[in-house]
């Protein structure tokens, strides 16, 4: 066994684990083989890692769930290659887990643990027994005496289990109550969960493999709605359900399939068991079960498998989403069971066809008593013809039935229909409840008025209504008895029912898509339960069902139960709204006509007024009572909802606290489990490794320690189990409190519904009384009143049409006026656009020109910058090279310093090198001489000998000179290039400075102009305005005086004309005296003088206007403002025109006075002399008065002229002073500008000098740095010289000591000393030769330098000559360019030479 492989060990370990879980032992062979593949993929993962890390693991565990996932988890994707193996593995290993009953949860937990990966907590048999006892106690505790079935019945308004059962396949219809007896049957369906392992999944069959992928896709869409509190991982205990319901697990998958494939399809006949799901209710509400599930989801962390946590969390997530999405399905089971032993139908079975949640078309159920079986058939047709996706046939059928009901005058049906419609619209949206109730109230009132006004055609209908009313009362009593009998019975498991009859009708097989959002019972409780009692009364009113007809009634109910609340989806809303609008559109017309008829009949018949008034009062009182009751109901509902919310909040808080505590406990559990698993792994490894060997005492001790630790862990686990039990008891207590509260609220709600029902009965009674009173009225005046109503309507229509015509005419006129305005505005806009476009074009042209100029200028600047950049690049290169050379020289200096550090070594090296060189030179010279001797001996007159002789003579000198000259030329070329570049740089700097100066100058000019403009505006504007005002005042005064004088002259002319007529008459009759003639002459003279004065004044005014114009021109010139210039010119022109007009008027206003009238001799022929004398005297008096007036006027005009002259003089003086001050300021500004210009122009020279100074300073700094370097070198040289002297002294001392030592030694030493002396002599000779050579070299250097200096001077002269020539050439070019500019300015065209003429060769 020690040599066993790991796989065999794993197999044996798996068998051991299977033996612990009783059920899975049978299939251990299969799991042993297939777990090899699976276990390799699985690794233990700690609890804090999210499920996203398991994406690539495929199906991770045995108990695979295909339900909705959590927010954090990704949907588990199937791999096709491994799917068959994994399904087989599921069948082999997971059957026992999924097929066991909920009473065997201890085995479930153990198998869950045993299926974990290697080393995740092993449970002992003692633990298993404790768990069995614990869960048995829990299940016993669940069967409490509290009956929750009644609450589930009454609160649930959405009966969706039947509908979902219809969607299931026929293969799954074999699940009945005996499915818990045989485990083999469950093993056949091992892919799916058993009914007992889910809590809130109800009424759907098990899912197959085909449904796996759609469910996974839909699980993605449901991730968002999952709250964050559910993100903790859940174990296998999430699947443990304590016999709450035997509903199927795969409910959610059906919903998801419905969502994916919402198209209706034909369904087979179903048994009663299929219709009702599993059909068993254990009295738990959805909220209690949800709380229990949350508690067990968190407890299961301690027992969960780490590799299967993902799948298990998916299942729990689906539980919770199903609780939210389908909270009514659990409660539907309890309703379906109700009372199977008794033959009597329950309240729920009677209420089902009338409920609002059965598509809200319950009103169609209410047929008249006369129609029996036909009505039943039609009823089933109505119910079957209203699925989600309505056909046009269905709508037409519905509308036909609606018309049929209206034709029969069945008001109750209409009333029920409208109420159902309004409440059906309120079902999907709870917020519209109050609005729908108000709508129902209005419809009630309309129908009551209609009842009061409309005359019933026959008394037979009234008799029928009375009969139905009596039968209603009797059936109400029956229903009350039944309601008392039924709700308090405990729910029991129903036996399998007989097969029901299939639905009759055209659309019986059409199903709903089922993806609607069903409304929760908490929200819809108040609105739906309110209508139930009302609907019971009405259905019993019209049907009057007796106990003998109960079998038939059950058949009808079996047909109507198939209608689901999933119809509250959007398509259904559309169809219902269509129906309701049609019905509403029909009702108001009837009520309006009835009201009209009522008013006419009241006006015509005075007999029934008192009765009608009494009926009205009664109806109003009933309405008031009803409204008061409704207000009370609303208040009670509000309080009820508030209490509900408070309770919910408390429950949520408690749940949160419990979840936190459970989470902590789970964490602790997990840590302890991890420790246990590690201990167990080590224990197992040691056991298998040391198997077969002698047991050491050490291993025994270790085993004891491990057992102790295991016992401690077991005690801890027992403590945790006790804590879990305590928490579970708390949860149970809270649920019981919640149930009690719900029962209390339910009772209150029932009492309120009973009050509403009593109020409605009173309403019905009052309505029937009013109908009885109306039936007795005569019907003879109906046609007459109809005709009167038609007449009045026609007159009203005629008046309204006339008013419309008038209004339309007025509108037409207003529109015409607007149209004209728009036309004018359009023309103005066109003119304005034309004007603006012209101006804009001109502005655009100007802008284009300025832009072109700017572009050219910028291009020049760019070119200049590019050239400048090239120069800078060259300088940078040169700098780099210089830096490199400096670095090289520094390195050489360092080397030399290092070498010069020890001069004695250097001297020795030098001496050795010199000796070796001398020997080599001697050898080479000797060889050369020998070779030359051989050549001479062999070929005395040959070319090589001659060449040697010539080369020995003068080749060396020529070569040296040529090389020297070449070097010199290169050096000079380099200098010239450097000078050229320097010249370019200087030019660039000059250009830069010039541009800078130019920009500064321009900026300065702009600033000065701005300052000038500001100053002129500040100083001149008030003065000029004052002058302009004075001028305007003077002009106005002058014009007034001129007008007055013209008026006076006209008067005088008129008088003169009269006097001339009289004078002519008197001359004819010789009554004219000498005095009169004298006076006339005086008057003429005065008139002439006045005319002359007027002309002089006009001249003066013209002069003044000219001076004003001149002043204005001067001001315009000074301000240089174009806008003001135009304005002043216009004013000047106007002044001139005024003067001209006035002069013309004066010239024309004085025609010839004497020559204007002709002589008429017969005017005074018949007049008497005395009359003539009287007339003459009167005229004399008048003339004197006129003369005096004229004198006064003359005095006035003179005074006015004096004033005018004074004012003009003052104006002239002021303007002269102002002009003088302006000229002075202008002069000052010009001087300032000149000074600035001179300073700026002179500053260019200053800048040059400054530049030279800067260059000199740079040179001085450079020389100073060189001097400093030399000084430092000098100091180092002094130090080195001192060091050399000391060393020399030491050497001399040592040499003397050596000599003394040598003298004291053998003759060999003497010989050595002699050789040394010879060497010294030879060195001395060598030094002398070197000195001579140095002298020769210095002499040659001096000669070369002199020649170089001469060459440099010569090249300098040449360069200066070239520069002068260039300057001359530039000046000539400038002059030529100036001439060309002048010619171009004058318009002379200069002929340009062609390229071939320019390039023609010269001979």
UniProtKB/Swiss-Prot annotation:
Membrane-spanning intervals of the chain: none
Basic and acidic residues bias (residue ranges): 208-231
Keyword Amino-acid biosynthesis on entry: no
Sites bearing Phosphoserine, chain numbering: 157, 160, 474-475
Keywords: Cilium biogenesis/degradation, Coiled coil, Cytoplasm, Cytoskeleton, Microtubule, Nucleus, Phosphoprotein
InterPro entries: CEP162-like
Superkingdom field: Eukaryota
Record bears the keyword Flavoprotein: no
CC per GO annotation: axonemal microtubule; centriolar satellite; centriole; centrosome; ciliary basal body; cytosol; Golgi apparatus; intracellular membrane-bounded organelle
Coiled-coil ranges (or none): 617-670, 698-1121, 1171-1206, 1235-1386
Bias (Basic residues): 487-502
Chain spans, region Disordered: 18-42, 170-231, 476-504
Annotated localization: Cytoplasm, Cytoskeleton, Microtubule organizing center, Centrosome, Centriole; Cytoplasm, Cytoskeleton, Spindle; Nucleus
Subunit structure comment from the entry: Interacts with CEP290. Interacts with CPNE4. Interacts with alpha-tubulin.
Family: Belongs to the CEP162 family.
Further details from the record: Promotes ectopic assembly of transition zone components at cilia tips when targeted outside distal ends of centrioles, generating extra-long cilia with strikingly swollen tips.
Protein's name in the database: Centrosomal protein of 162 kDa
Species assigned in the record: Homo sapiens
The encoding gene: CEP162
